[in-house]
Regions:
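Basic, amphipathic alpha-helical segments enriched in Lys/Arg and hydrophobic/aromatic residues
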Residues: 71-72, 76-79, 97-148
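Short, charged, surface-exposed secondary-structure boundary motifs
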Residues: 89-95
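Polybasic low-complexity intrinsically disordered regions
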Residues: 1-86, 134-138
Length: 148
């Protein structure tokens, strides 16, 4: 092993790795990042958006709810549709576009498709680069029908 973690984190359920994913409007993967399972989602959000050529709308779940991230997306020329965290107080949920938020399922569907590959869902690879290669291969297989 090397001096860094190979993006394998520890949780009460055992070793874990998160895949942070950006998809296009058709649900096809554009870019992804790996992180340790115990790391918070918002830590990798700006890096993921930075990799995108064009940012129109960022739709994300409550894990990405942060005002600095919303400002970052606005600076890139996009808008955010992110569910607000409750923080134990009443929040105006009418400010979020619920019709657009329904498209968040495109990301979940992409995860469901790659989790069909056993080597990805259970992560047999010890090295981060090998696991990232397998995830990339699965995403390429999702793109393949577009060109055949």
């Amino acid at each position: 092993a090397t001096e860094y973690s190979e993006q394998i984190g520890q949780s009460c359920g055992g070793n874990s790795t998160k895949i942070h994913l950006a998809v296009d409007s058709g649900g096809l993967p554009i870019c992804f990042e790996l992180s340790e399972g115990q790391r918070h989602d918002i830590t990798y959000a700006e890096n993921l958006v930075e990799k995108l050529d064009e940012v129109n709308t960022v739709i994300a779940d409550k894990g990405y709810d942060s005002e600095p991230f919303r400002c970052f997306v606005r600076q890139k020329g996009g808008r955010t549709v992110i569910a607000k965290r409750n923080y134990g107080k009443d929040i105006d949920k009418s400010s979020m576009d619920r019709c657009l938020y329904r498209y968040r399922h495109l990301v979940e569907n992409a995860f469901a498709r790659i989790k069909q590959y056993r080597s990805i869902s259970t992560r047999y690879d010890k090295l981060e680069r090998n696991y990232a290669s397998m995830v990339s291969l699965a995403f390429m297989l999702m793109w393949l029908p577009m060109y055949c």
